Amino acid sequence: MLALMALALAGAWWGWRRRRNSYSDWAQHFSFWDGQEELTRRFDCLYVGTSEAGLPLQRVAVGPLSYRAKAELGLHPTGLVLRARGSKAIVLPAAGLRAGRATWTIDRTVEPDGLLMVQWILGPHVVESYFRLVDTDLGQMVDAINALSKERQA
């Protein structure tokens, strides 16, 4: 029984390591937030995960997108700032941002439309990040992100 558990843990470790290695070149496309400018709004949330657009079970495992964490989202004219606990803050560029609602992703299912889904561009890749908001009106957040994207495109 112990050998079976050790084999399962080794398989999980090997799979996670392989996934992280397959996304290692994506890290060069991150824009890190320097924190010099003030955010227009801040929201506490739980960062759930990021997947490739259209592939909701394909977790993107690179840098601050690798693990679920308590986080803060901030609105800024240049984009949406994601500050996950224990990681450097990154900017999801306003150009190409699109927000909506979701019920499930990777390993999380909630009540209907209970997750915030943000589609954004990471270098040449289109990805979708999912968040569980804390004490925030989800509809207002979706509208604010979509307005930010429209302002940037205008």
Region annotations inferred by a language model:
Residues G54-P56, L82, K88-I90, L122-S129:
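Short, surface-exposed beta-strand/loop "edge" segments at domain boundaries and coil↔beta transitions
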Residues A3, A8, F32, K150-A154:
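Intrinsically disordered, low-complexity linkers and terminal tails enriched in Pro/Gly
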Residues L4, L39-T40, L65-Y67, G74, ...:
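A generic structural signal for short, solvent-exposed coil/turn residues
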Residues R18, G96-A154:
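Acidic, Ser/Thr- and proline-rich intrinsically disordered linker/docking segments
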Residues A12-E72:
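Anionic N-terminal interaction surfaces
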Residues M1-R17:
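Alpha-helical transmembrane spans
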Residues L65-I106:
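Phosphoinositide-binding peripheral membrane targeting modules
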